[in-house]
Curated annotation (Swiss-Prot):
Source species taxonomy: Eukaryota, Fungi, Dikarya, Ascomycota, Pezizomycotina
GO cellular component: cytosol; eukaryotic 43S preinitiation complex; eukaryotic 48S preinitiation complex; eukaryotic translation initiation factor 3 complex; eukaryotic translation initiation factor 3 complex, eIF3e; eukaryotic translation initiation factor 3 complex, eIF3m
Coiled coil: none
Origin: domain of life: Eukaryota
Matching InterPro entries: eIF3d
Record-linked Pfam families: eIF-3_zeta
This protein's name: Eukaryotic translation initiation factor 3 subunit D
Location(s) in or outside the cell: Cytoplasm
4Fe-4S among keywords: no
Ranges annotated as biased composition (Gly residues): 108-131
The record's note on its domains: The RNA gate region regulates mRNA cap recognition to prevent promiscuous mRNA-binding before assembly of eif3d into the full eukaryotic translation initiation factor 3 (eIF-3) complex.
Length: 586
């Protein structure tokens, strides 16, 4: 075989082709356009319109060129095999401000809601920091992008909440009585423990009755004519609200050993409805021998009718409202206004006629015709006894309560007299701070009465619970709730009666989820604690305590006070009243 020459092989190669496999210019594969690709590329998407936007907020032309030009997600790597590379023509280049301006929506002068994190480095749609929800509360002198809480002067960083910061009171209220250094705290009970107590007590029995009653004016039950509402009148009538230990009837019953515990319905209802209360209040407890008296101080807050105490945004004092709140809408001013309304509404809604007057067993025990110049108000006092004994008690434990009723009404079926408790709810300004989102009574009272009453149950839960408890303690047959509004929302001088609604006390208690068994359980627990504290004391020794509701926490505190506590305050109050009387006479 002849030897193979390398020169012959090289000479036999085609001169027009290069070294390697045969090159094909066909870009079709079985009739389908074919593009070269790399096996390392991730396939599966026809196009990608969600390119990475981590640097999207960095403005400028260089950022645009770096992030958005020549982005080929489908193909060989991140470079383009098909784009035509042309020289950049900068002849028509101009700087354009592409900064995104976000228009913040505000409520009034400030206060929108934005969803934004603590750190603002990322772009739109990011997760943000821990505080995912912040409220913008810009005032007149603040920027629109300030956060709600600016107490720490943090600017745009917002407020970092600490341990149990949510449980701290939003506002600081003053206690109803100044805690003195010589008082010693004996017990502290939170409302959660109180709400678990229960004692099923009987309905009670009447011991004696005093006073008289007029009949209720049924014309107030009718819907008033528009723009012709009845004005609330200020009537001069003699009405009394004497504390327990100064009641001559209770003193007589105590001497006869008719009961061991004595109280009035307004004091007892506050204690039974304590878990619903928000404002501070106090009850003086006197233990003398084997008798326990639940008393109140002179000028105590128990005598005032609160307004929107349980509202989520309760009325503010002037110092707390940054000068925007009018003085007539503060809690103290509203309480005085509501007390005035309740006193006069009960007097105005009865028909004062001597021929339609029903006398109780005894006359009014507090009225002295020789000293008083004003006529007596329609009021009936019922002294009722309740048995708080347990099966384990060696001796019965009875309680006498002075209850009150305001008017009578004829039963339309059998014609019998039914006793009523008359109270009034008041509207000050449905658009003002502290209104609790209440509806406009003038336009909604008769078309949406259920919604109006439901709102009042929410905003005045404690007040309505006390009134219902007082009606049940008095064994009243019905309740009349008046709806009284200001004639002018900016003035507390004149009021109009918009309507009256009637309820049965037991049914009304069921509507507002009022459990009287829990209230009796609270009373029995306090009584047992007082008796246990004085178990080793002498029988004739007088010990005095005060039960105080914390103004800022749902807590009751029991203090031991000196036996002569509050007597100086009562004497000073009497001297002040005498001085005022002398000045008026002069």
């Amino acid at each position: 075989m002849a030897p193979i020459s390398i020169a012959d092989i090289v000479a036999a190669l085609p001169a027009e082709d290069t070294w390697g496999p045969v090159t094909s210019a066909d870009n079709m594969l079985d009739g389908v356009p074919y593009a070269p690709f790399s096996k390392g590329d991730k396939l599966g998407r026809m196009a990608d319109w969600t390119a990475d936007s981590k640097d999207r907020d960095r403005g400028g032309r260089q950022a645009y060129n770096r992030n958005y030009r020549d982005q080929q997600v489908y193909g060989a790597g991140s470079s383009s095999l098909f784009a035509v590379q042309v020289a950049e023509d900068e002849s028509t280049f101009s700087v354009v401000d592409n900064t995104r301006t976000s228009a913040k929506r505000t409520f009034g002068r400030g206060g929108g809601t934005v969803f934004r994190g603590r750190a603002q480095r990322g772009g739109a749609g990011q997760r943000g920091g821990r505080a995912g929800f912040q409220r913008v509360g810009a005032g007149r002198g603040q920027g629109g992008d300030r956060y709600y809480d600016n107490r720490g002067a943090r600017g745009n960083r917002g407020r970092r909440f600490g341990w149990k910061d949510y449980d701290k009171p939003q506002r600081t209220r003053e206690p109803s009585v100044n805690i003195r250094p010589d008082w010693s705290m004996l017990e502290e009970v939170d409302f959660n423990r109180l709400s678990k107590l229960n004692l099923q007590a009987p309905e009670g029995e009447d011991v004696d009755t005093y006073g008289f009653l007029y009949y209720y004016d049924r014309s107030y039950d009718k819907a008033p004519v528009k723009n012709a509402e009845r004005r609330l009148q200020a009537l001069d009538r003699a009405a009394y609200n004497v504390t327990t230990s100064q009641d001559p009837v209770i003193q007589e019953l105590a001497e006869k050993n008719q009961a061991t515990i004595f109280a009035t319905s307004d004091i007892l209802s506050m204690l039974m409805c304590a878990p619903r209360s928000v404002y501070s209040w106090d009850i003086v407890i006197v233990h003398q021998g084997n008798k326990i008296y639940f008393d109140k101080r002179e000028g105590a807050s128990l005598d005032l009718v609160t307004v929107n105490e349980n509202a989520a945004d309760a009325p503010l004092e002037v110092a707390e409202s940054s000068g925007k709140q009018e003085s007539i809408n503060t809690p103290s001013a509203l309480a005085l206004e509501a007390t005035f309304i309740n006193h006069n509404f009960a007097l105005q809604t009865v028909v004062e006629a001597n021929n339609a007057k029903v006398d109780f067993n005894h006359p009014n025990p507090f009225y002295n015709a020789e000293e008083e110049t004003e006529p007596l108000a329609s009021k009936g006092y019922k002294y009722r006894r309740f048995d708080l004994s347990l099966e384990s008690d060696e001796e019965p434990l009875n309680m006498i309560v002075r209850t009150e009723v305001d008017a009578l009404v004829k039963n339309p079926v059998n014609g019998e007299d039914q006793q009523l408790v008359v109270k009034a709810l008041n509207e000050f300004d449905s658009k003002a701070q502290g209104s609790g989102g209440s509806l406009d009574w003038r336009s909604k009272l008769y078309s949406q009465r259920g919604a109006v009453v439901a709102t009042e149950m929410k905003n005045n839960s404690c007040k309505l619970a006390r009134w219902t408890t007082q009606a049940i303690l008095a064994k009243a047959d019905g309740m009349k709730l008046g709806f009284v509004s200001r004639a002018n929302p900016r003035s507390a001088a004149a009021h109009v009666v918009l309507g009256v609604a009637g309820y049965k006390p037991r049914e009304f208690a069921a509507q507002m989820n009022l459990n009287l068994g829990n209230g009796w359980g609270i009373v029995r627990t306090i009584v047992d604690r007082i008796r246990a504290l004085d178990a080793d004391e002498e029988e004739d020794k007088v010990t005095k305590y005060i039960l105080v509701k914390d103004p800022n926490r749902p807590v009751l505190r029991l203090y031991s006070v000196p036996a002569n506590a509050f007597e100086e305050d009562d004497e000073a109050a009497e001297e002040e009243q005498e001085a005022k009387g002398e000045v008026e006479e002069a």
